[in-house]
Amino acid sequence: MTRWTGTAWTGTRIDTAPRRSTGAARRRPGAEAHGPADPRRGTDPLRVAVVAPPWLELPPDAYGGVEAMCSDLVDALVRRGVAVTLLAPGEHGTTAAFRPTGPVADPRLMGQALPEVVHAAQLPELLADLGVDVVHDNTLAGPLVAASHGLPTVVTAHGPVQGALGTYYRALSVGAALVALSDAQRGDLPTARWAATVPNGVRPDRFPFRAEKDEYALFLGRMSPDKGPVAAIDAARAAGIPLVMAAKCREDAEVAYFEHAVEPLLGGDVEWVGEVGGRRKLDLLAGARCLLFPIDWEEPFGMVMIEAMACGTPVVALRRGAVPEVVDHGRTGWVCDRPVELPGAMLRAHEIDPRECRAVVEGRFSDAKLAANYERVYRRTAAVAREAARPAS
């Protein structure tokens, strides 16, 4: 086992894709531009610990993009022959080995720091006897204890990287392999030492494909002004298309925003169904004429877009953040520059071939692609750590 020195990344870069030059066309995550299989991939068994957040069991029942990604990733890594141990709260729910971090954190505390800090503080002890080559941390606070457990660490930035979070991730990138979800996210923090860009993925066979769609459009996500629920209502009504709204609405800020800005607009052609998961979520995704994604922030990725596409459902979205990297305009959906363009795009959703939507997910955004990309990052991270640990000649 190689002990991480915290300095191995100085002057060193690993990546699943080359940097794009200034002004070049944005590369689509998962496309071949991210590179072929690493010819240096070894045959030695790779041992990885994947750390999930403290908020939900894996796999999640309803909302939980990070948890869904972690669940699909560890299962796909196991299928590739990687020895994976999942560190997560609650009960064992994947094919990976499991080490519980404790009970699921109180959902009333979601968004607060203490559960994250307590979760992170346990990691050195939990990792001490696992003998892993690399730790893949998907939490916010967990990377802060990397120096304590001394293991090479890969950190995925699952959220925004601007402002104070940018300062945080920039500092982390000095001693850990920092992974972006998209080129857009990476571009929001160009001063960080990004190690790789690895787009999210889903397991396609878990999403029911439907070629024939119903009339409704779907808004699915989190109840926040960033996600554009009011813009979704306005667009659907302007297009004369019924809208089904399903969103996580648990935290105080989410509830307050819903009651103030969204609830007064409901009724008639706009149906609120609350937070959904399981079969209900899949049926809504598969039956919708389109997923409406009118975001008002720099979205790092947008997992719900590839979930919809896996069901053969096109995406109608605003051009913010990673949207142009995920949605192929005119092939898997319509990317609009202004909210006023959304109604017309919704009326053209039938022009998108559902089979193309599914094919893009299978080719670029599958769990198999996700695992292959991360295995490449893990192996390179371990190799850099071994090289740094060698005594100077």
Give the residues covered by each predicted segment.
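Catalytic cores of nucleotide-sugar-dependent glycosyltransferases that transfer UDP/GDP/TDP-activated
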Residues: 2-5, 10-393
